[in-house]
Amino acid sequence: MGFKLLDFYKISPPVSGGETDPERSVRFKRIRWATFLSATTGYGIYYVCRLSMNVIRKPIVEDGVFTETQLGIIGSCLFFVYAVGKLTNGFLADRSNVKRFMSTGLLCSALINLCLGFTNSFFAFVLLWGLNGWFQSMGAASGVVSLTRWYSSKERGTFYGFWSASHNLGEALTFISIALLVSWIMG
């Protein structure tokens, strides 16, 4: 079981040459653009899962679910675990199938956000939000690794520049989607 899981995250073998074949060249360029758009959109969605707490912070305090101090502790857990995870997950992303690695982190982060909606226990929030920090740390490294694998050193600066705007996309998506959801629920 354990080895099958490792095989799931194993880097795909490189595809043989054929750079002179025009059909393969077109396909290669299409895949590179798909990779760039996937990494940018994916990392933007990571931010939706990271910033959701900021949108609901005020109602949580006003309803007496948590105090500002408790929310500060919860938020600190995410960033402490995120820092440790970014170090280790950066190393792992560099040695794994980055598509699967990034997808796993995003899926787990989304599931944790969903679970947070079913609890009002401070300790459960600390544990889940810290765990969210771990899965969040899988996002940036995966995006950087995928761009590094698909773009030459001369092209990377341009694509990294555009990719780095993905957090702005994620922040906009967060505030718009959460606001729409809350207004829909509140009527």
Indicate residue ranges for each PLM-predicted region.
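Cytosolic juxtamembrane N-terminal segment immediately preceding the first transmembrane helix
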Residues: 2-48
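Extracytoplasmic
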Residues: 34-68
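Residue-level signature of mid-helix packing/kink "hotspots" within the transmembrane helices
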Residues: 51, 79-87, 171-172
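Membrane-interface helix termini in secondary transporters
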Residues: 59, 90-91, 180
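Conserved MFS/SLC helix-loop-helix module at the cytosolic interface between two early adjacent transmembrane helices
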Residues: 84-122
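Short hydrophobic/alpha-helical segments at membrane-entry points of transmembrane helices
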Residues: 121-129
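Cytoplasmic helix-loop-helix junction between adjacent transmembrane helices
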Residues: 128-165
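Glycine-rich segments within core transmembrane alpha-helices of 12-TM secondary carriers
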Residues: 161-178, 182
